[in-house]
Amino acid sequence: MAKIDVHHHFYPPAMRQALDRAGGDPSGWYIPPWTLELDQDITRQMKVTTTILSVTAPGPGIEPDVTKAAALARSCNESAAAIRDAKPQQYGFFASVPSLFDTAAVLKEIEYACTTLRADGVTLFTRYGKGSNYLGHAAFRPIWADLSRRGAVVFIHPTHPVDTQLINTWLPQPMFDYPHETGRAAMDLLTSGILQDYPGCKIILSHAGGTLPYLIHRAATMLPLMPRTLGLSTEELVEAARTFYFDTAISSNPVTLKALFEFAAPGHVLFGSDFPNAPHDAILRFTNFLEAYELPEETKRQVDSGAALELFPRLKGILDKAKL
C-alpha cells in the first residue's frame, strides 16, 4: 500500500552554500547532512513509497538581496524537479519562493514552478520580513489570490520568530518555539479574512498544526465577545480552522494525536517525517508510534496515502497505475 511523506526536506547544493555563507540557520538548528542515498535509506525504513520534497526554513530568504533570493528559489526548484523527473513515482516537490514582500518575483516563480516544472504545491513560511509579518499580511493578498486561482496546495512551514534569542542553549527554536509560530500564522489566516477571500487553496500546517488544535477554542470563544469582533461566531471560527490539513511530522505521541484526530476534519491528517532535520532515531520513534496507534483502518489509510492522493492528482494517476 502507498505511504506518502508530505513533510520531507532536502538540501540542494545552492541552498547549502547560501546557508554556509550566512553563517547557518538563524533559529540555531544545525544543518543536517542530506544526500539522495541517505534519503532513500530513511524512506525504506519508514516504508514510504513517495516523498514530497521541500526546502525548509529559512529558505531562499536567507539571501538578503532580492535578485539572489529569486535565483536561489529557481535553483532549488529545478533541483527538486530533476529528482522528481528521475523517479516520478518516488518523489514530488513543493516549490520554493523568495520573500512574499517581493510580490512580482514570487508570482513569477509560482508560475514557472507550477506550469513549467509541474510542482505539487508551494512552500510558504509562517512569517516574512523583519517584523511579525504573518501570512495574513495585506501585502501578501496578491499571492494568495494567485494560489487560490490555481487551487494550489500550500505547505506552511514554521520559521524563526523575530526574536531569535533562545530559551536556553539546550533549546534551539525548532525544538519548542516553531509550533507556536505555526499556531500564530494559522490564527492570522483565520482572522485576517484570507481563508474567506481566497478559498481555493488547500493548506497543510506542519507538525500537527502546532498550537492551533490546542488553543483554537480559547480564541474562538472569546473573539465574538470582544468589543471589536470579526463578525464570525465561535462555531464558524472553529469550523474554518478544521479546513486546514495537518501533517504528523515529529508529533506522534498520545496527547497530540488524540487532540489532532478529535479536532481535524476527516481526511485532513497526512503522514510527515521531517527528515533530515529531526534526528534519525526521533523520526523512527514518532513513525513507529503512529503505526502502532489505534485508529480505524480507513483512517490509517487516509493518513498514509488517501488524503494525500486527493491533494495530488499527479501522484494518484502514477500510483494507481503502479497498483500501490
Swiss-Prot record:
Zn(2+) binds at residues 7, 9, 157, 274. It comes from the Eukaryota. Pathway: Mycotoxin biosynthesis; patulin biosynthesis. Patulin was originally used as an antibiotic and specifically trialed to be used against the common cold, but it is no longer used for that purpose since it has been shown to induce immunological, neurological and gastrointestinal effects. Genotoxic effects of patulin with dose-dependent increase in DNA strand breaks in brain, liver and kidneys have been detected in mice. However, more recently, it has been proposed that patulin might also have anti-tumor properties. The keyword Transmembrane does not apply. It catalyses: 6-methylsalicylate + H(+) = 3-methylphenol + CO2. Induction: Expression is correlated with the production of patulin. Expression is positively regulated by the secondary metabolism regulator laeA. Expression is strongly decreased with increased sucrose concentrations. This decrease is lost in the presence of malic acid. Expression is increased with pH changes from 2.5 to 3.5 in the presence of a limiting concentration of sucrose, 50 mM. Natural phenols present in apple fruits such as chlorogenic acid or the flavonoid epicatechin modulate patulin biosynthesis. This is 6-methylsalicylic acid decarboxylase. It comes from Penicillium expansum (Blue mold rot fungus). The gene is patG.
